[in-house]
Amino acid sequence: MRVFNFSAGPAAMPEEVLRQAADEMLDWHGSGMSVMEMSHRGKEFMSIHEAALTDLRDLLGVPASHRILFLQGGGIAENAIVPMNLLGARKTADFVVTGSWSQKSFGEAKKFCTPHLAASGKTEAGFTRAPARAEWQLSDDPAYVHLCTNETIDGVETFEIPDLGDVPLVADVSSHILSRPMDVAKYGVLFGGAQKNIGMAGVTVVIVREDLLDRALSICPSAFEWKTVAANNSLYNTPPTYAIYIAGLVFQWLKRQGGLEAIEARNIEKSKLLYDTIDASSFYLNKVEPAARSRMNVPFFLADETRNEDFLAGAKARGLLQLKGHKSVGGMRASIYNAVPLEGVKALVEYMKDFEQRGA
């Protein structure tokens, strides 16, 4: 029996994609091979690779000025790879810290430069807001400005993306990429791990403006130097072939759903239903300011936290899984990525209401 999976990542996958991958597991398109057995330079995999790149460019509207790269290491590795590729001769990078992940990025950058805290969304209640551009205090000559546009742990999403002129904006989009349209031209670099909205863990997507490819530090490993990866069409070393294949299937699925405009409408409906339920209750609490609430990751707390384990056990009995909040913040968290259907959110909301009534 399939359950409703609210995991923050690796996360729920579209069932159509899972079924297609199962059907093609032993024999991809009459090749007699599984995708995971193919040479990454053979014509069969090359067709998969090129289709994935093309479909992602189409979905996001990536302009010709930007290159799409498939790497490995996830978002965590990019926290080191970004400064190694962008610092050049500069010694400072600016950070807007809106949650746990941008805080990690800030800390990792200390190994390569002197990071400057341009703004913070931290309050007495934790990370609960996305600072407006007017609050950002940029340094005199930063190599770039880093922003995590959706904080998976804290449930903070930044919707207003400013124009920073000549300063490249770097965004960690791991947990909301492909959930809504984006103006890619505003960014110098976008990066994200795949295991939330793109596909399975193993491949990392980097979208980088071409004029930024000449800034790498000499210490940057060649396998992670964007210029080298771009020059080799993401095939400098053996790529995560099966993860790229799965990502390609997800891109095709997104196109069949009507593209990102249609997906955004679904995500608004799902998140609104869940937040409205929380706000109408005196038993559940979300601490994030309404304007910064994530559509993908919804943390919430029970008024009586001694009942947390009962809540999780009851949810599991109804086929509602992986609702436990991150260990650093506690409580609950429902990650409602693209592949989580509206029916799953409705089932969760119904359970939340029942649980509250039983405890009243």
UniProtKB/Swiss-Prot annotation:
Annotated InterPro entries: Aminotrans_V_dom, Aminotrans_V_PyrdxlP_BS, Pser_aminoTfrase, PyrdxlP-dep_Trfase, PyrdxlP-dep_Trfase_major, PyrdxlP-dep_Trfase_small
Cofactor note: Binds 1 pyridoxal phosphate per subunit.
Superkingdom of origin: Bacteria
Record keywords: Amino-acid biosynthesis, Aminotransferase, Cytoplasm, Pyridoxal phosphate, Pyridoxine biosynthesis, Serine biosynthesis, Transferase
Pfam families with a match to the protein in the record: Aminotran_5
Names of the cofactor(s): pyridoxal 5'-phosphate
Cell compartment(s), UniProt: Cytoplasm
GO function term, MF aspect, one: pyridoxal phosphate binding
Catalytic activity: O-phospho-L-serine + 2-oxoglutarate = 3-phosphooxypyruvate + L-glutamate; 4-(phosphooxy)-L-threonine + 2-oxoglutarate = (R)-3-hydroxy-2-oxo-4-phosphooxybutanoate + L-glutamate
Position of the signal peptide: none
PROSITE patterns associated with the record: AA_TRANSFER_CLASS_5
Example of a GO cellular component annotation carried by this entry: cytoplasm
Residues involved in pyridoxal 5'-phosphate binding: W101, T152, D172, Q195, N237, T238
Oligomer status and interactors: Homodimer.
Functional description taken from the UniProt entry: Catalyzes the reversible conversion of 3-phosphohydroxypyruvate to phosphoserine and of 3-hydroxy-2-oxo-4-phosphonooxybutanoate to phosphohydroxythreonine.
UniProt family annotation: Belongs to the class-V pyridoxal-phosphate-dependent aminotransferase family. SerC subfamily.
The protein's name in its UniProt record: Phosphoserine aminotransferase
Organism ancestry: Bacteria, Pseudomonadati, Pseudomonadota, Betaproteobacteria, Burkholderiales
